[in-house]
């Protein structure tokens, strides 16, 4: 196994841990979202929301870095991430590059905007919860590609 494939395998293993942690956060947040009165949230609920937002963001970020590593292995120009996304779409890892970008915009918006608007914050959190399944699907398709193309075992 080349050094780059070993690095790719370690990224996939790390993604699996991140996926598990994100799943835990989803379970915690689903217990109290939507939130009727944000100021009344308990400290542990705020902590669960913060953990969910961070884990969601980091999971997508690391998934993107892993897709970039696959593109490098396949000798695709990775100077522009849009090229990586288009390549992942061709491999059928992603449904569409636009959907990936929508998820990225969502995570950026929830981390920077509307913190005083309960309705918008609820909508962002609920949409993020709904998009977890898409990210997990992209992750699984990336694992499948790496297993077929490189014989990598991501466990």
What are these regions (language model features)?
Residues 1-155:
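Solvent-exposed interaction patches of small proteins and small membrane subunits
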């Amino acid at each position: 196994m080349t050094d780059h494939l070993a690095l790719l395998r370690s990224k996939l293993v790390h993604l699996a841990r991140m996926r598990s942690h994100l799943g835990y956060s989803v379970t915690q947040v689903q217990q109290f979202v939507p939130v009727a009165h944000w100021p009344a949230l308990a400290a542990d609920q705020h902590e669960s929301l913060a953990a969910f937002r961070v884990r969601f963001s980091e999971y997508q970020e690391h998934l993107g870095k892993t897709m970039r590593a696959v593109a490098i292995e396949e000798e695709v120009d990775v100077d522009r991430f849009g090229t990586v996304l288009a390549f992942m779409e061709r491999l059928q890892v992603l449904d569409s590059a636009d959907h990936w970008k929508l998820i990225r915009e969502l995570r950026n918006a929830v981390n920077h905007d509307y913190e005083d608007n309960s309705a918008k914050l609820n909508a962002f959190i609920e949409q993020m919860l709904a998009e977890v399944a898409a990210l997990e699907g992209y992750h699984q398709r990336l694992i499948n590609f790496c297993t077929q193309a490189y014989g990598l075992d991501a466990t």
